[in-house]
């Protein structure tokens, strides 16, 4: 009986436990709203409306540049050595194929030197020299001769111009297959290319576009019978152009026109409009009601070019000829790609930062150099170099900039939208930045609007890193400068100390030139001029300078070098700096300080005055370094 009773008790406990599990209430999840589109801090939904930004301009429909003026800007870019812009109409029709093979080998070898040691393929294999040897062997055209004729090609698909004639990816992170260094630039449907070589495996053409040179898949290019047919495909008169200015669209599917079905059309694509015909005439088996009838290029089975009718819905983002370059139209095109994925080199059928701006301006007939490095070579394009501007000076300049100006810092380009509620806004396609929520590096990989106080992955704000501004539609005469706000009298000195790294802005980013300078700032400045020598960290320092504090090394150096001994064993770094004290420090710092090098006064020096003195001290110190020379 005891054993039966024992199992009965165990069974009862199990049943009770099961009841508890079944009947116990499940903790309710916190109510969460369904996901909605996210925006960066400070960005609202109304800011995604182009009219929000163009409405900040007095006359958003005023013409910023005429087609003739933009043609002159295009010509200036083409004439600029190193811009990689070329007039496709003027390309020579013959070339030395053997010499080109040699040039391709040398160029590929240079690319390998750049990538070797930090690149993986899509299978997670780190690429070694022997891997690159196999890849680069494919650049050789086995049929090259000393005298060859250019083959004139037309892109039949939106495709990528890539670095190597190779099906693989070039990844800096084997876990991140969406960031591929292979693409150089996107090639749009109906874009012309000049074909100079075929890869050893026959899968790729070596081509030149209007802005870049690289490799493209053979199946994406149709070869015209001659240059005349090639020119007729893309060098269109204004009355025949249809320009797509949205992010992307796809042609309708039709069983009777499979070659024209489902074709991706991307920003900046220019297609040929068909001539008007009988109103009852069918286009791909239907009337072209509410549609533009156009021609799309196709590649025949033998690789040759032909064109087929297609329909483009008139409700798409299309324009008869290039859009007039106005503020309203610029805002409309600039925001058309919001939310699209980032694609390095215009990969993933999308854009990177500079290719987006290139595509935007192509919608107006302005064909800029492909990237910021090449753009800055064009002398006639206004280039305002602001790397050494204080934050106050940058803000004054931004206040005067028009929408559509291109702002740059190393590694990124963005388009300026305007100022709202004291914040400066830009649109760009971004790979990564410091998350404003977690403070960690985050892959945004998106075309987005954000403020300039957002931080890069290095922790610095975008506005603090700005170093160049371009205004693409303005052409300057030789020696002419783009008008900008008058710089303050102290700009020479503040820009000097910022460029040399002798003084820093405050953590807010502002230089605050009128604020009183301090002893710590003066000692820090002298230490930096001296080259930041390492002091004896074990030696006795100042009682009020904590280990690891901002000015610890500078303070120790100044004490050990006999430049500044402090007061009563204290550094007193936050004490205001007078001209006389700076003069004393200067006399001890320089072997032979010139008279009047710094202000000799009991008045407190402002940060602008300290910057002026820093420039003078730096110059005197450099002069003392120069070896004595004998005049001949």
Question: For the regions a protein language model found, what residue spans apply to each?
Answer:
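SH3/SH3-like (including bacterial SH3b) beta-barrel domains
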Residues: 172-188, 255-267
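Feature responds to low-complexity, polar/acidic, surface-exposed segments characteristic
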Residues: 480-492, 499-500, 504-523, 527-554, ...
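Glycine-rich catalytic cores of cysteine/serine-nucleophile enzymes that process amide/ester linkages
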Residues: 248-310, 339-351, 408-453
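...with weaker cross-activation on analogous glycine-rich loops/strands in unrelated enzymes
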Residues: 186, 369-437
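Active-site nucleophilic cysteine motif
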Residues: 344-375, 519, 523
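Aromatic- and glycine-rich peptidoglycan recognition patches
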Residues: 32-50, 211-214, 219-251, 258, ...
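Boundary regions of SH3-family modules and the immediately adjacent low-complexity/disordered segments
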Residues: 31-162, 166-173, 178, 194, ...
């Amino acid at each position: 009986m005891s054993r039966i009773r024992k199992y009965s008790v165990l069974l009862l406990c199990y049943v009770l436990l099961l009841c508890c599990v079944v009947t116990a209430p499940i903790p309710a999840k916190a109510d969460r709203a369904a996901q909605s589109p996210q925006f960066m801090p400070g960005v609202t939904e109304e800011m995604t409306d182009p009219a929000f930004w163009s409405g900040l301009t007095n006359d958003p429909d005023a013409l910023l540049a005429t087609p003739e003026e933009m043609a002159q800007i295009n010509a200036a870019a083409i004439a600029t050595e190193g811009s990689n812009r070329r007039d496709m109409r003027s390309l020579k029709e013959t070339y030395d194929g053997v010499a080109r093979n040699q040039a391709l080998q040398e160029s590929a070898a240079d690319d390998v030197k750049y990538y070797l040691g930090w690149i993986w393929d899509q299978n997670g294999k780190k690429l070694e020299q022997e891997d690159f040897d196999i890849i680069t062997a494919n650049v050789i055209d086995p049929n090259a001769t000393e005298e060859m004729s250019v083959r004139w090609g037309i892109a039949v698909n939106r495709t990528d111009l890539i670095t190597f004639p190779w099906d693989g990816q070039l990844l800096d992170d084997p876990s991140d297959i969406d960031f591929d260094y292979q693409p150089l630039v996107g090639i749009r449907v109906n874009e012309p290319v000049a074909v100079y070589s075929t890869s050893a495996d026959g899968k790729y053409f070596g081509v030149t576009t209007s802005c870049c040179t690289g490799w493209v898949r053979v199946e994406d290019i149709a070869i015209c019978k001659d240059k005349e047919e090639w020119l007729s495909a893309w060098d269109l008169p204004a009355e025949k152009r249809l320009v797509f200015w949205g992010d992307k669209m796809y042609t309708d599917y039709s069983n009777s026109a499979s070659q024209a079905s489902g074709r991706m059309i991307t920003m900046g694509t220019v297609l040929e409009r068909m001539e008007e015909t009988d109103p009852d005439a069918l286009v791909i088996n239907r009337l072209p009601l509410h549609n533009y009838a156009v021609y799309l290029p196709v590649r025949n089975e033998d690789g040759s070019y032909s064109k087929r009718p297609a329909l483009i819905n008139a409700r798409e983002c299309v324009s008869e000829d290039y859009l007039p370059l106005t503020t309203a139209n610029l805002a409309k095109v600039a925001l058309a790609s919001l939310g699209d994925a980032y694609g390095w080199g215009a990969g993933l059928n999308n854009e990177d930062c500079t290719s987006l701006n290139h595509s935007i301006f192509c919608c107006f007939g302005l064909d800029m150099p492909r990237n910021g490095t090449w753009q800055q070579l064009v002398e006639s394009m206004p280039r305002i170099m602001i790397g050494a501007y204080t934050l106050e000076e940058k803000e004054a300049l931004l206040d005067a900039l028009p929408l559509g100006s291109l702002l740059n810092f190393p590694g990124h380009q963005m388009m300026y939208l305007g100022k709202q509620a004291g914040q400066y806004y830009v649109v760009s396609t971004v790979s990564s930045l410091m998350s404003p929520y977690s403070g960690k590096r985050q892959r945004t990989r998106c075309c987005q609007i954000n403020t300039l106080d957002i931080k890069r992955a290095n922790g610095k704000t975008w506005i603090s890193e700005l170093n160049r501004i371009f205004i693409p539609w303005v052409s300057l005469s030789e020696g002419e400068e783009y008008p900008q706000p008058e710089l303050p009298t102290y700009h020479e000195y503040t820009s000097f100390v910022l460029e040399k790294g002798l003084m820093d802005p405050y953590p807010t980013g502002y230089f605050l030139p009128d604020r009183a300078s301090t002893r710590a700032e003066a000692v820090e400045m002298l230490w930096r001029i001296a080259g930041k020598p390492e002091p004896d960290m074990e030696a006795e320092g100042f009682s009020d300078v904590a280990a690891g504090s901002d000015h610890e090394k500078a303070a120790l150096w100044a004490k050990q070098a006999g430049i500044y001994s402090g007061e009563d064993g204290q550094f007193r770094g936050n004490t205001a700096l007078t001209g006389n004290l700076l003069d004393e420090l200067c006399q001890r710092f320089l072997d032979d300080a010139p008279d009047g090098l710094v202000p000799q006064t009991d008045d407190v020096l402002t940060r602008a005055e300290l910057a002026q003195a820093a420039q003078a001290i730096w110059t005197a110190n450099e002069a003392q370094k120069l070896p004595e020379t004998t005049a001949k």
